[in-house]
Amino acid sequence: MRRAAVQLVRLRAVSQAQAAVAFGVAPVMVWRWDQALAAGGVAGLVPARRGPKGASKLTPQLAARIAELDAAGKTLREIAAATGVSTFSVRNALGRVASAGQHAAAGAAAESAGLAAGDDDAGQGAVVPVLPDPVPRDGERALARWGLLGEGAVPVFTPGARYPLAGLLLALPALEGTGLLGAAREVYGQVKDGFYGLTATLLTLVFLALAGEPRAEGATRVPPAALGRVLGLDRAPEVKTIRRKLGELAAAGQAADLIMALARRHAAARPDALGFLYVDGHARVCYGTRIVQKTHVARLKFPAPATMETWVTGQDGDPVFMVVAEPSDSLAGELRRLLPGLRGIVGEGRRVTVCFDRGGWSPALFADITGAGFDLLTWRKGPAPDLPAEVFTTVTCAGDRGRAHQYELADTIAELGISEGPRKGQTVTLRQVTRRVPARAGATRQIHALTSRTDLPAGEVCWRLSSRWREENYFRYARTWFALDALDSYAASPDDPDRMVPSPARKAAAARIRQAEAAAQAAEAARDAALLQLRSPAPGQAAYLSNQVINALAAPVEAAWRELDEADQAAAAVPARVPPGALSPDMARLDAEVKQITHAIRMAACNAETALARALDGHYARAGDEAYALIREALIISGDIRPGPGELLIRLDPLTAPRRTQALAALCDQLTAAGARYPGTDLVLRYEVKSHPTPA
């Protein structure tokens, strides 16, 4: 190319400027080529080798010496002076130079030494390329297209450095503890043949959730090649593929079985965390044009179209399982429906305590709970007589995290009458623990807790019931990070025509009755005041009461009572409950199958993240405040992935601060000791963290 440019200029076929434009160089470069050809012939046009002209000084022995000095706490300048190389070469040897500049010939030896530092014990001392191309999977994709591959491609990892999202692999040991993959295999068995099998699909959704993109649409914001590398594939599935796979699972109609299988595994892995189960309803607000039944949304403080769900969490606030509640059903009704499922999760004969708020208030339900072999803990609803001040004592209780709580408590017994169901007329006797708290203007008020547990100290009764807010904390956290309220499917079906819902006309009729009652009372008060004035005239003034006067005063009262009678009759004619079609012919129920599947996946992801955060306890000074933030940072950090004989080494890059890197290193030691395997392979997972850069 250079010789051709010079010859064209010498033949005056083109000018020097035209040749420069044609060959994409500056005019001065064409002139230099002319001078080089004249001075050295064709050999003078051959570009010289860039970079160092000799062999690299960073031999394996020198790189090992640099690593020893770095481990001894020497600075970069001290190491450079001791080894006779530059500080830049020291950084190269320690792997602290950005990978973009490490492909040059002069830095090849430095990159090899830097990436291999500390890995000799694993036999990984060879050069590892930065972001290599994945293993081609075109043949497997072609087989999958014709249905000949079977269920999913096998994960294959390419040794490489600086893989984005390598930190997501930290979640695999904790995810194994949740039992998600095993539960899904138990429920669904083998899914439809394709390149992405059941395990790859579930791992994709879990990794997306942990990367901050829990919805299927989040796959558009995560590079598919980057996510594919941690899946052991050439690329991750796209949004349409994820939706299709979710649709295939939903078509089986076994989402509830998946959640129950996941709950049984949770109970088997953490039986001590299920001594107290917190149950509460959650309103998932629905936005859009579909007509969905309205329900009261506590966080919005007004009714809105919503789907009701009932959630059960352990005593630590970790989600155990959930069910889609029946529309218009109360928490008391849902609790009664959940009792057989709870027994199947905790096992026969085990007596756990079910905790819930006043929404589950029902003496008949209390009898059902204790009759089913459970204990209960709840707040008392409705007015109750205050206890005298002398029965209260100050009690100190230590929580499960060592924090002391002080209460003013009174311990008594309460008998509640049952006014409904087959136990109507019976009574249920419960222990009542009353707490006295400050109120406005220096006053006090009393809050009553009811329980069937007689063995618990009064302070623990109060603390356990207050800990119900851990479930609310999960709702808030999952709404922010795990798309708790997201609409994962646009499918809907007509509402059940045989279902009965409260009639809005009943409310209007009751309001008319209240207005008529108020009008009748006002008319009677006006009549009585007029009669009193006529019967008590001023001194010296005569008063005459005739039938005409009395009838005139009584006429408004009689009219008001007639209005009240008419309102009562009209209200009696209005049915208390009507079919949904009577309110709106287009009333619909949103699809719950896909949502339950995504709930199960995100519950497992959240529990895995929580397990990692708890593992930092004792290794990170601010774990109580920053554990989750550190885990979220670690999950999206880059790192090296090195498959070896029977193992998969994940060597992560350091975090933003040395103290956080040290905490991550302690976490990696725990995860390595767990001996988990990458799903679908026999590769044992090993974790390491690169040392944090030391300023020169």
Language-model segments: which ranges?
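An anionic, glycine-rich sequence signature occurring as long contiguous blocks
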Residues: 135-148, 321, 367, 372-471, ...
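Short alpha-helical "recognition helix" segments of helix-turn-helix
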Residues: 17-23, 79-81
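Short, conserved catalytic/metal-binding motifs centered on acidic residues
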Residues: 5, 66, 204-205, 219, ...
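Dynamic "connector" segments at or just before major functional cores
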Residues: 1, 114-302, 310-329, 336-345, ...
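Key DNA-contact positions within bacterial/archaeal DNA-binding proteins
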Residues: 28-31, 88, 240
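Short, Lys/Arg-enriched anionic-surface-contact patches
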Residues: 1-2, 47-62, 190-197
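Short, amphipathic alpha-helical "recognition" segments used to contact nucleic acids or chromatin
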Residues: 1-14, 59-74, 202-210
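Short Lys/Arg-enriched helix C-cap and helix-to-coil transition segments
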Residues: 42-55, 95-123, 254-263
